[in-house]
Swiss-Prot record:
SUPFAM superfamilies per UniProt: RmlC-like cupins
Protein name stated in the entry: Uncharacterized protein L612
Domain Cupin type-2: 37-110
Keyword Metal-binding appears in the UniProt entry: no
Cell compartment(s), UniProt: Virion
Length: 160
């Protein structure tokens, strides 16, 4: 089930995360947050990135990950099933699947949204595609277009 509405969204996030076959799948987007499922191949990573305007919460549902944080990747955190990491806006970070054989299954919550609603990346993007680089126009465009339409739909019709 995918939701791109400003409505209450109920899902068994563990079940959906474990069965997600895609590198990245956006399943819920609201004006203030976004729920994204991810599946990383053995030794695959989420690129070293920074979200200037987004807080990010990452929870590991299956597997073991290494989280590197800081401009110089100077802090290392080992994350196992059931653990989470909360990354404040403006913090450099990278998530790495530490397994040689098993997929890493995780979900992440961005606040505010960081990817176009409903986006699915079957494989890890090779260049850009993270939505986190300041020059990434496409993702910023969709992010603010979505916010604009949500705001516009909340204004009484007689004022439109």
């Amino acid at each position: 089930m995918i939701s791109n509405q400003n409505q209450v969204y109920v899902v068994n996030v563990r079940e959906e995360t474990l069965k997600n076959p895609y590198y990245r799948r956006v399943i819920d987007t609201s004006p203030h947050q976004q729920l994204v499922l991810m599946s990383l191949k053995p030794k695959e990573d989420i690129k070293f990135e920074i979200h200037p305007d987004n807080d990010q919460h990452i929870r590991i549902e299956k597997g073991t990950a290494i989280a590197l944080t800081g401009k110089n990747k100077d802090t290392k955190h080992v994350l196992t099933e059931g653990m989470c990491i909360v990354i404040p806006a403006g913090t450099w970070h990278q998530i790495i699947n530490s397994s040689n054989t098993d997929y890493l299954k995780l979900y992440t919550i961005y606040s505010p949204a960081d990817h176009p609603p409903g986006e699915i990346d079957v494989r890890r993007p090779q260049s850009g595609g993270s939505g986190s680089k300041t020059g990434d126009f496409k993702n910023k465009y969709y992010k603010y277009k979505y916010k604009y339409f949500k705001l516009r739909s909340s204004v009484p019709r007689e004022l439109n």
